[in-house]
Regions:
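Acidic/polar residues at beta-strand termini and the immediately following turn/coil
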Residues: 28-30
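Acidic (Asp/Glu)-rich catalytic clusters
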Residues: 106, 128-130
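Conserved glycine-bearing catalytic or ligand-binding loops at nucleotide- and phosphate-handling centers
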Residues: 171-189
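Glycine-rich phosphate/pyrophosphate-binding loops
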Residues: 107-117, 136
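Thiamine diphosphate
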Residues: 2-23, 32-79, 87, 93-97, ...
């Protein structure tokens, strides 16, 4: 039996705006409008404005999505540049190959896609974009832990599978960095495939205070003679800052490093980290093949023989839960990070 269904049939607001009813919270039955008050601006909102501004200056910029214009923040781009907006439907593989084709003809395509859906197009990323070194930018939304959307929407794989290709990968930790690095990635400074990833929701207030220096990495905390450094990227940095404060209260001095360029590493970053005896690297990413694994190898190749603590996702099946709950379950909350450092310090003292 072949049954043809129609999304939203029988309910006017859903038929008129099917993308809004893909997943819903409480809403008014008569109007279809959400009952919840409008939330603060998100990374997606800021990306939406930034890509429109950049497209005004560069006529070669085109935006591609796979049936997610609303979720990826491209509705504004679609209205402003209809001739440069392409929704290919639920066909992520085609989105990537289409982008490669446009790039081969001198355009600058930006593939706007959720991290979890980017997985569907990995073959095309390798063969059609990466091997040919096509000038394609990947804007990866919903990166890292994703609340509410469930187990299948966790953005925990893209750092691992993109770093295998040597693709430049950036992860802003606030809106200023998002705007700056998106501008850089769409400039002549880069050529070939590259990616920027950002989480669902808004920026962390504490991370926003650090602004954007334009550097590949920064120290958020620096103390004299520290032998321990905590390293991470994106939202996980907020937990590192909390862990650093708690460790300071326990008389354990730590520096905190923020990575913006996740891969490939710069020689200077590896050299700076080689000065420490204990390095804790935390990330909302699957452990195998992750940025942390690459970094540990790079340090060892540089002759470093200190203690490397890698806090990452060890179980690929994450629960449907809030970000705080997922971090607690995976050992990526501040309490677990503090415990990991304390254990490493104690072990080191026992070896003396």
């Amino acid at each position: 039996v072949h049954v043809l269904t129609e999304k939203g049939r029988g309910y006017g607001p859903a038929s008129s705006h099917p993308e809004r009813f893909h997943g819903t919270g409480p809403f008014d039955i008569q109007s279809g409008r959400p009952l919840a008050a409008k939330t603060a601006p998100t990374y997606t909102d800021h990306f939406s404005g930034a890509i429109c501004s950049l497209a005004e200056k560069n006529k070669k910029v085109v935006a591609i999505t796979a049936a997610m214009p609303d979720g990826t923040g491209l509705n504004r781009f679609r209205k402003k540049f209809p001739e440069r907006f392409f929704d290919v439907g639920m066909a992520e593989q085609h989105a990537v190959t289409f982008a490669a084709g446009l790039a081969s003809q001198g355009m600058l395509p930006v593939v706007c896609i959720y991290s979890t859906f980017l997985q569907r197009s990995y073959d095309q990323i390798i063969h059609d974009v990466n091997l040919l070194r096509e000038n394609v930018v990947f804007a990866i939304d919903r990166a890292g832990f994703v609340p509410a959307d469930g187990e299948t929407h966790q953005g925990i794989y893209d750092p691992a599978f993109l770093s295998q290709l040597g693709m430049p990968l950036y992860a802003p930790s606030n809106y200023q960095e998002l705007n700056y690095w998106l501008q850089q990635l769409l400039s002549d400074r880069f050529h070939g495939p590259r990616a920027i990833r950002y989480p669902r929701g808004g920026q962390d207030a504490a991370l926003a205070e650090f602004g954007c220096t334009g550097e590949d990495y920064d120290f958020l905390r620096k103390v004299d003679d520290a032998t321990i450094v905590l390293v991470s990227y994106a939202d996980e940095l907020a937990d590192l800052l909390q862990a650093e404060r708690e460790l300071q209260q326990k008389s354990i001095a730590c520096d905190v490093m923020k990575a913006v360029k996740l891969y490939p590493f710069t020689c200077k970053m590896v050299a700076d980290l080689s000065k420490y005896k204990i390095i804790l690297f935390a990330e909302e990413c699957i452990a195998n093949g992750s940025i942390g694994e690459h970094l540990e190898y790079a340090l060892q190749q540089n002759g470093w023989n200190g203690r490397f603590i890698h806090c990452a996702v060890r179980n690929a099946c994450l629960p449907h839960a809030s970000v705080a709950q997922i971090k607690q379950a995976t050992g990526l909350d501040a309490a677990h990070l503090v415990q990991a450092v304390q254990m490493a310090v104690t072990k080191g003292e026992n070896l003396l």
